[in-house]
């Protein structure tokens, strides 16, 4: 059944429909699209129409005039705005194929392991309405583990921690199945929110998402630097007291303080998962360690922070941002894998 569903060489694609970014893997070609999951809408006669999607739309975040808005249709790894998400998926699928009259693709989509039946159905229906012929769903930690090269088909335990924009997925896998999974709604977005809140509280400075993301990427760290303040960057925003633009300097230590809460939640999720892991699989994980994937895995010092709190070796995947999409793509390329990883989630 599964080989007949995705086995033919065609336009078949795998989609990592992330809160922050959407990646598309096309069968036989690899990753062909990586764009922000952002849509800009324009008000025309009381009706909202799509103005821009992806990279162009993200550049408009926080900068739109009154008759326009830039929004993220995905929140916490699931669809928050059904109609807008559908338009976004449709746009990306058409951009990938870039020609008229193509055969509608069969699609594999990643979903958070903690997604409800209603949330899974929303993703399934959005893809169908966007032009997919049939849709298969795969849990994100399974896709991340495959993309990171973990031996998920073997009778041995593997642990993956996938830190995305909206959620962190912690899972223990063995024999093509998920033995334990925990999905916590903390990820890159919560880190950005924590930085925005810190700047407001400690500097009376209002900054936007784009500036917060820049702070996270340039000096963000899971632990304060040993030599004091560490690197510093200048940040511009609006003074909350005077209402005028102002510039302040923020250090690595301050960034670590700002990120302490979301980092702590990720570490706690890992510890809870380890406590719930069966003894034999826990022994395997003690030998092989924990694999970090997702954009959040790039936060400096996060691997060391998890290692210090668990006593286990922690490895960041070679290409953490692409692991989920690559894992989906591997399933797409090798139909014999499908029964093991899609059977429980096929919609």
From Swiss-Prot:
Q: Where in the cell is it found?
A: Cytoplasm
- Family according to the record: Belongs to the FtsA/MreB family.
Q: What is this protein called?
A: Cell shape-determining protein MreB
Query: What is the recorded function of this protein according to its Swiss-Prot or TrEMBL entry?
Result: Forms membrane-associated dynamic filaments that are essential for cell shape determination. Acts by regulating cell wall synthesis and cell elongation, and thus cell shape. A feedback loop between cell geometry and MreB localization may maintain elongated cell shape by targeting cell wall growth to regions of negative cell wall curvature. Required for mid-cell peptidoglycan synthesis and cell division. Directs the localization of the cytosolic peptidoglycan precursor-synthesizing enzyme MurG. Also required for proper chromosome segregation.
- Chief localization class? cytoplasm
Q: Which GO terms describe its biological process?
A: cell morphogenesis; regulation of cell shape
Q: Which UniProt keywords apply?
A: ATP-binding, Cell shape, Cytoplasm, Nucleotide-binding
UniProt superkingdom = Bacteria
Q: Which PANTHER family match?
A: CELL SHAPE-DETERMINING PROTEIN MREB (PTHR42749:SF1)
Read off the InterPro entries from this record.
Answer: ATPase_NBD, MreB, MreB_MamK-like
Changes seen on gene knockout: Depletion results in lemon-shaped cells that possess defects in the integrity of the cell wall.
**Could you give one GO CC term from the UniProt record?**
cytoplasm
Q: Which GO terms describe its molecular function?
A: ATP binding
Assembly behavior: Forms polymers in the presence of ATP. Forms pairs of protofilaments that adopt an antiparallel arrangement and bind to lipids.
Q: Which residues bind ATP?
A: 19-21, 165-167, 213-216, 295-298
